[in-house]
Amino acid sequence: MPQMAPISWLLLFIIFSITFILFCSINYYSYMPNSPKSNELKNINLNSMNWKW
């Protein structure tokens, strides 16, 4: 079984690293939360925290 040269390992590592960084950044920037819905949920959670001592 032939062995790979160190430059090939470095190139392979660079390609996988760039692919991983691109994949993570695309996933991060593709998520767009719905602002009005999150504000309504926040208000509901704040109003439901009435402690009866």
UniProtKB/Swiss-Prot annotation:
Keyword Oxidoreductase assigned: no
Localization terms from the record: Mitochondrion membrane
Keyword Transport: yes
GO molecular function, one term: proton transmembrane transporter activity
Top-level taxon of the source organism: Eukaryota
GO cellular component, one term: mitochondrial membrane
Membrane protein topology class: Single-pass membrane protein
InterPro entries: ATP8_metazoa
Residues spanning the membrane: 4-24
Keywords of this entry: ATP synthesis, CF(0), Hydrogen ion transport, Ion transport, Membrane, Mitochondrion, Transmembrane, Transmembrane helix, Transport
Primary subcellular site in the record, as a coarse category: mitochondrion
Pfam families for this protein: ATP-synt_8
A biological-process GO annotation: proton motive force-driven ATP synthesis
Protein task: Mitochondrial membrane ATP synthase (F(1)F(0) ATP synthase or Complex V) produces ATP from ADP in the presence of a proton gradient across the membrane which is generated by electron transport complexes of the respiratory chain. F-type ATPases consist of two structural domains, F(1) - containing the extramembraneous catalytic core and F(0) - containing the membrane proton channel, linked together by a central stalk and a peripheral stalk. During catalysis, ATP synthesis in the catalytic domain of F(1) is coupled via a rotary mechanism of the central stalk subunits to proton translocation.
Similarity section: Belongs to the ATPase protein 8 family.
Subunit structure: F-type ATPases have 2 components, CF(1) - the catalytic core - and CF(0) - the membrane proton channel.
Protein name: ATP synthase protein 8
Gene: mt:ATPase8
